[in-house]
UniProtKB/Swiss-Prot annotation:
This is Mitotic checkpoint protein BUB3. One of its GO terms (biological process) is mitotic spindle assembly checkpoint signaling. The lineage of its organism: Eukaryota, Metazoa, Chordata, Craniata, Vertebrata. Its main location: nucleus. It comes from Xenopus laevis. GO terms for molecular function: ubiquitin binding. WD repeats lie at residues 8-49, 52-89, 91-130, 133-169, 220-268. Found in complex with bub1 or bub1b (phosphorylated). Component of a complex along with bub1b, mad2 and cdc20 located at the kinetochore. Interacts with znf207/BuGZ. InterPro entries: G-protein_beta_WD-40_rep, WD40/YVTN_repeat-like_dom_sf, WD40_repeat_dom_sf, WD40_rpt. It is found in: Nucleus; Chromosome, Centromere, Kinetochore.
Length: 330
């Protein structure tokens, strides 16, 4: 397996048959680190067998795919610029178009506690889908284009354009539980909920991350904070990079961030410190995913056209075995 290591050491390798264009999302199967789902601007969704380093299957959309999610080990859901939400049976390799949005679908997540698929779109709505039928189970207006969303137990945290954050209760979508403004000054790039369900992490295009808490009480809100990251001093000038990706370690509640500087950092939010930084990757980190057991981190290094169409390294997915020393609060 380590023949693919190329400069990365024995705890990391590169996946074969990577997508042919930008990588939009990497997601591990809910109960194993064996399978990884990857969506891409090449209009494909790919399923990889990670330990074997092989692509198991690939299915197509009519346009670039912006996000994907596992519903269960044998069903993938995905959406993108073709506005269509697809469910794909990974056993039979069969497609179902479940429904659509009026604009590109930016986010696809599964909520196990309520058993719904959630999609967020640039059409300024969130839609819920019943995966059993499968069919639409409701459409809910948001204040602006949906850029990111994350499921926390039975709650849904939505980040939109205009730096807005909304907290919804997936069991009762009749009204918004909380309306917030991002505590960061610049556009929201990614929101991910803490596995312990107490809060979320929000990253922006301007090299910053905020750690936020859901409980609105003053006592709890005092604990929130933000910090700078993914900034590099070059010739005495500070270069500031977008923080594109956040992924939580399910057991430790620590999290990884990936930026357009090509670095991945792991943070301890409780002691407010960085636990480690990996080597620099060849280009921007577009997406990150810890496996459910926290043993493995998938890292998508994929140019995000921050500087328009310049020559850039080919898109790649690195699979890294992580240790407690790198991920456990100290």
């Amino acid at each position: 397996m380590n023949t693919q290591t190329d400069m990365t050491g024995s705890n990391e390798f590169k996946l074969n048959q990577a997508p042919e264009d930008g990588i939009s999302a990497v997601k591990f199967s809910p109960n194993t680190s064996q399978f990884l789902l990857v969506s891409s601007w090449d209009s494909s969704v790919r399923l990889y067998d990670v330990p074997a380093n092989t692509m198991r299957l690939k299915y197509q959309h009519a346009g670039p795919v912006l996000d994907c999610a596992f519903y269960d080990p044998t069903h993938a859901w995905s959406g993108g610029l073709d506005h269509q939400l697809k469910m794909h049976d990974l056993n039979t390799d069969g497609d179902t178009v479940v429904g659509s949005h009026d604009a590109p679908i930016r986010c696809v997540e599964y909520c196990p506690e309520v058993n719904v698929i959630v999609t967020g779109s640039w059409d300024q709505t969130v839609k819920l889908w019943d995966p059993r039928t499968p069919c639409n189970a409701g459409t809910f207006s948001q204040p602006d284009k949906v850029y990111t969303l994350s499921v926390s137990g039975d709650r849904l945290i939505v980040g939109t354009a205009g730096r807005r954050v909304l907290v919804w209760d997936l069991r009762n979508m009749g009204y918004v539980q909380q309306r917030r403004e991002s505590s960061l000054k610049y556009q929201t790039r990614c929101i991910r909920a803490f596995p312990n369900k107490q809060g979320y992490v929000l990253s922006s295009i301007e090299g910053r991350v905020a750690v936020e808490y859901l409980d609105p009480s003053l006592e709890v809100q005092k604990k929130k904070y933000a910090f700078k990251c993914h900034r590099l001093k070059e010739n005495n000038i500070e270069q500031i990079y977008p923080v594109n990706a956040v992924s939580f370690h399910n057991l430790h509640n620590t999290f990884a961030t990936g930026g357009s500087d090509g670095f991945v950092n792991i943070w301890d939010p409780f002691n407010k410190k960085r636990l480690c930084q990996f080597h620099r990757y060849p280009t921007s980190i577009a997406s990150l995913a810890f496996s459910n057991d926290g043993s493995t981190l998938a890292i998508a290094a994929s140019y995000m056209y921050e500087m328009d169409d310049i020559d850039h390294p080919e898109d790649a997915i690195y699979i890294r075995q992580v240790t407690d020393a790198e991920t456990k609060p100290k």
